[in-house]
A protein has these predicted regions:
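Positively charged n-region of N-terminal signal peptides that target proteins for export
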Residues: 1-4, 394-395
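Alpha-helical scaffolding within the catalytic cores
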Residues: 45-51, 74-94, 115, 189-192, ...
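Metal-dependent polysaccharide deacetylase catalytic core of the NodB/CE4 family, i.e.
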Residues: 60-144, 246-253, 278-281, 285-294
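Substrate-binding cleft of secreted/luminal carbohydrate-active enzymes
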Residues: 230-300
Length: 395
């Protein structure tokens, strides 16, 4: 059975407790030749040891997703002398077996396709992962396409090795210009109909939420503002209470070699951990989240886009605002009865944000003449709380 997933969840935010967010760190190492250099590899190895120890001590989770070039370096550079610092194990076996880091294949598939990378992980002595660590969702991924893996596939470099994943995460596009930013779990139909759930397909998508990336060009304060936005959206009821929210925090493994970058990762980890300690979030690897979704949530298909809001809101504090004319042919006036600047947000029937502006006092005009007719929702908020909510009709 194929069907579109219902995303217009109706609920009262006051009546239902909101779920916890499942945070997880996610790292990639790319196909770049820097991993061929032994000094670079060894410097990174020390950073991995330090970070894995820190995450384990503080109960934080990490999915490390590796491509072929780095894995070959692990196979060729892990000497007996080097492994003395990691319980006489390779760095990846130690991270997984001793520190609880999940290991998944990640493939650009320019030479090694996903089964080949899975074979390299197996050669290192790691257990088989059933997670595809990212792929182009709406087109080919290098020389391959994700639909080839639905029923399993043999490798190109290792033609006798067969691998069938259960899940794929993310939903990328070339150069990451228009990646999917969704929460939830569903079985995509194909590259052209990725958001349509197909219960006959084996391969399941794990949505990893909004795009939150740690980079040297992105400030700590901006990263944490993104984290705060996700937490607030779930806890305030903007996102459905029956949803399952996995939010990954991404970084490039090679960037750990820079001390300032490494320290930024630690700072973000500590700040996110404050939400965990407050009881509104938890740390979960992708496998842990998937298992919880299957068992506790009964594998209920769910799909929610980052920034989308629930279609039902509470019409409150009408004495604080007058909205007219209703219905309207395109121009809406918002008269505020209270002083001070507030944030006005307007959403369409699908819960998508279509207008955002600052307003103050009476006579605030919103020109919606280019928008299609239908029911629209508005929300007023200050820095501390939502002050008014309601709806209006465009003809």
């Amino acid at each position: 059975m194929k069907h579109h997933i219902l995303t217009l969840c109706l609920f009262s935010v006051q009546a239902i407790a909101q779920p916890k967010i499942h945070f997880d760190f996610l790292s990639h190492n790319e196909e770049s030749s820097q991993w061929n250099g032994t000094p670079y590899y060894n410097t990174n190895r020390l950073k991995l040891i330090s970070l894995a120890n820190y995450f384990q001590t503080n109960g934080m989770t990490w999915n490390m997703q590796s491509d072929w070039r780095y894995l070959i370096s692990v196979l060729t550079k892990e000497t007996a002398a080097l492994m003395q610092s990691t319980n006489n194990k390779s760095i990846l076996r130690w991270m997984h077996e001793d520190k609880g880091v999940e290991m998944d294949p990640h493939a650009h598939e320019s030479q090694y396709i996903y089964p080949d990378v899975a074979k390299l992980l197996d050669s290192i002595g790691l257990p088989e992962s059933k997670v595809m660590g990212g792929s182009i969702y709406n087109d080919s991924n290098g020389v391959n396409v994700w639909t080839n893996l639905v029923n399993g596939q043999y490798g190109l470099v290792f033609p006798n090795y067969f691998w069938q994943p259960d899940c794929m995460m993310g939903g990328g596009t070339p150069n990451h210009v228009n990646d999917l930013k969704y929460f939830g779990f569903w079985n995509p139909q194909d590259t052209a109909n990725y958001l349509i759930h197909d219960s006959t397909s084996h391969l399941r998508h794990i949505g990893v939420g909004c795009e939150i990336k740690i980079k040297d060009t992105i400030s700590f304060s901006f990263i944490m503002s993104q984290v705060n936005d996700v937490v607030n959206a779930v806890q305030s009821g903007q996102y459905p209470s029956n949803g399952f929210y996995v939010q990954t925090i991404f970084f490039e493994q090679g960037d750990l070699n820079d001390t300032a970058f490494y320290n930024k990762v630690i700072a973000v980890a500590d700040s996110v951990n404050a939400f965990v300690m407050a009881g509104v979030a938890q740390w979960s690897t992708l496998k842990q989240s998937y298992t919880e979704w299957e068992t506790i949530y009964n594998a209920q298909v769910f799909q929610w886009e980052c920034g989308q809001m629930s279609i039902k809101i509470n019409e409150t504090a009408s004495q604080l605002i007058t909205v007219y004319p209703v219905p309207s042919s395109g121009k809406i006036i918002f008269d505020l009865k209270s002083s001070g600047v507030q944030e006005l947000e307007v959403y369409n029937q699908e819960g998508k944000l279509v207008l955002q502006k600052q307003v103050s006092g009476p006579g605030n005009e919103a020109d919606l003449r280019s928008f299609p007719g239908g029911i629209y929702l508005y929300r007023l908020s200050n820095h501390e709380e939502i002050t008014a909510e309601g709806k209006f009709i465009l003809e």
